[in-house]
Amino acid sequence: MKQESLYVTTNDPPADSRPTAIYVHGLASGANAATGKILSKRFDNFNWITTDFGEDLAANVRQLNECIKEHKPQLIIGTSMGGLTLMYADAPDAVKIAINPALSISDCVRNTIGLGRHKYFCKRLDGATEFELTEEMCKGYEAYIAAHKPSLGKSSYAVFATHDELLGDEASVVAQKIVGGCGYKVLVDPDGAHRIKPSTIDLIDNEIVSKEFQSNTK
């Protein structure tokens, strides 16, 4: 992955004095996702890196693996499809945090988001403004999830909202059982939603980041 393709935050102190963190955005988003910027401001003791990911889960996992290999992050956070992507990425030395991982992505696309063309929510580095979701993609998601087991990081967490307005509450409960069975520690934000809220960030800070990175936290 070329350096010019990356979006890197510019929080002080200088980047080379902080550990690296990667943010993996969800479907219909990009490197300039608002959530990534919120996380980089809250956890500015890390040098945050992200890039544009596409709609192909297998390709996203390969792309994330390349980024991990190059930048050796200590922390990786992904939301929605980004949370799903990071669960399959090889990062044994990083703390993984999957927020509302979209294990039911195919059903969500078919029944909630809808097949066809859609606009991206933010400006992307690749210049793309629209993308297409197809039934073939949905089948590809299902095939990939069926054929692969989530991998663990140095520590692995999955954070869910009690009410997930996009994936559905029932799908969220099923996902909690699946990821918990794979070795991820499951945390639930009773005030959360699919789109990350301040309460979820507080939960991540208090229960994960502050404990996993005691020497790096403010």
For the regions a language model picked out, list residue spans one by one.
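Short N-terminal or domain-adjacent regulatory/targeting segments
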Residues: 1-15, 136-144
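Active-site catalytic motif of lipid deacylating hydrolases and related acyltransferases
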Residues: 11-12, 16-71
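Short hydrophobic segments within beta-strands
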Residues: 23-27, 77, 159-161
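Short, highly selective alpha-helical patches that border small-molecule cofactor pockets
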Residues: 32, 36, 40, 86, ...
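Residue in the alpha/beta-hydrolase core beta-strand immediately N-terminal to the catalytic nucleophile
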Residues: 74-77, 95-97
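Gly/Ala-rich beta-loop-alpha elbow adjacent to hydrolase catalytic centers
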Residues: 77-86
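Aromatic pocket-lining residues of Rossmann-like dinucleotide-binding sites
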Residues: 89-90
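The alpha/beta-hydrolase serine catalytic core
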Residues: 95-217
